């Protein structure tokens, strides 16, 4: 929001430098990006009067002009502008002057004719091309007839103004207007602002409602207020220079007297308005409704836009003519032939307008204000002010009466707060009089009783609803620098990690000790990637306004992000990569308002865990390596129930023959295995193994009691056993049976060989184990070990059908 200090002085008596004003605004209200001085860097640019204008003897487009610049003799200047003519007052850059772009003007010759200066267009003075009126876009700017030759040109163009460029935060939409900013500065400097008065004269011979008919079909929440005025016999012409100056200093291009009037009122009141060419309406009909599927509208920028069913439309009959609160349609644009204006003033829902502006990538001055909120109590006043201004500038008449499609009973907000609460929050000892004075400066009517303030908040401050908002206003006006510094009171406490935080921290250490590097992936991904590798069935959570098509949906799994990271590394010739990530996934059910956040931990390895080196053979990653990492990690959690791995083909993104679900007791807590070759190809990665665990579930599971046990001082005894067993019997089943039958002194069971080649019958495999026995208190007797070992052999034969070899 650009605030002209010249315009601001219409409201307040401020003999204060712009830099000081900007600093005060920034310290008290909103951020300031800087102070703009349009004439900065320009020198010796004056008003000129073209006395004569003759064709150049050696050019078909140049002119040789004699120009009075207030000196004893006129200057001869060669100019190529098509609109230069004798008698015009123009902008002259004298010899040795500086103009826009740090350009120095010198005496020169143009095709043999001396030229002692330059006749300037606005963009040559540094004006943004987007702000230059179209009628002078290809020529020089013509100054008013009363401009005095030789005077510096800056005051005639508003370039002597100082403009404060504010970055208005979403909660302070009231400062997107001159009125709102004036109220803010009046409170800061303890002044009473002079607000503009509206002098509207209606033509009693015409009634607006006789010609203009408005129907609002949209929901009252979407369109709480919709009003119109009718202005007849309007002449469309360029705006007077004072208005053009105010418009371009506000950062907008002057168009014509009607459009400029609506933009002027927009800047003054913060109320978006829209002017329709009444003669282009269908029998004077205005209908406000939601768009239908498949409808199109060509907007003022010439773009044909396919409308969405969430878009609010202004229609004439059933024909869309305007995207409500965003941009008008080309069909009802005000042109030089327009004579009757249908003027709209309305309140539209902020969310609706924000969605429309985002969906169509169409952000305008109007949509920005609707998104941040507008003063509902000022809509009718702004509409009247614009109608009066259009009638004055266009020599028209305002038809009597306002046509109301829908009205809103705007009631001020009342907030109650007591002095003790204010001082408690701010750490101050403010008096009743001090706080009352601040509310008076804010122009908030206040009733005080028993040290309690009942504050009536004007409709222009729609951001204030609760006591905390009033405390913020008091702090701002009192001055943040004046608030006392208060040391914390109370007994200090020592912080401690909770169980989840401690497990997460330990998990990271364990993964890194296993050779994995931490990765942090985006929580947002595509809908397809979000659903991939999900441990449990869930709805997805999608953003209403994603920043890109690649970041639309909250993830259900960490693995997809890790595979993206692997692909990134593989594309850069890094093929031996081992990553892990600890983070949240987001599960959602239809009845939930927001998704449930669950801590997961996942890993992915590809290439070789041990690269080829001198004396060391390369060891490509395989299922057993990643399963070993998972097993070691789960062991560190000291879970009470047994961990089991069950082969599965339920994960379509995983290899069906090399994937296992992980259970603790009967609860599914994760999976481990090889990524399906098709999935790996889609990600452009090599053979890859992954795991993912539900960390929240693991933390909640019961833990085994951990007790210290000293290392035995007595020797151990080992026994080896080899067996033929059915191919579908798992190692876990065999180990569980051996542990069950092995006796009190069995300490460890280790699988050391698997064979199913030649000499092994079909459907069978050979497994070999080492069993370690040890007593904590005495040296084991060989007979005791033999007895226990034979019980194991018997159990293997009887219960698993094993053939001992």
UniProtKB/Swiss-Prot annotation:
Source organism (scientific name): Lactiplantibacillus plantarum (strain ATCC BAA-793 / NCIMB 8826 / WCFS1)
Protein name: Phenylalanine--tRNA ligase beta subunit
Domain FDX-ACB: 712-805
GO molecular function per UniProt: ATP binding; catalytic activity, acting on a protein; magnesium ion binding; phenylalanine-tRNA ligase activity; transferase activity; tRNA binding
Top-rank EC class of the record's enzyme: ligase
Binding site for Mg(2+): 463, 469, 472-473
Family of this protein: Belongs to the phenylalanyl-tRNA synthetase beta subunit family. Type 1 subfamily.
Residues in tRNA-binding domain copies: 39-154
Pfam families: B3_4, B5, FDX-ACB, tRNA_bind, tRNA_synthFbeta
PANTHER family assigned to the protein according to its UniProt record, in alphabetical order: PHENYLALANINE--TRNA LIGASE BETA SUBUNIT (PTHR10947:SF0), PHENYLALANYL-TRNA SYNTHETASE BETA CHAIN AND LEUCINE-RICH REPEAT-CONTAINING PROTEIN 47 (PTHR10947)
Keyword Plastid: no
Subcellular location: Cytoplasm
Catalytic activities: tRNA(Phe) + L-phenylalanine + ATP = L-phenylalanyl-tRNA(Phe) + AMP + diphosphate + H(+)
A GO biological process held by the record: phenylalanyl-tRNA aminoacylation
Cofactor binding comment, as recorded: Binds 2 magnesium ions per tetramer.
Residues in B5 domain copies: 410-485
GO CC, any one term: phenylalanine-tRNA ligase complex
Keyword Cell cycle set for record: no
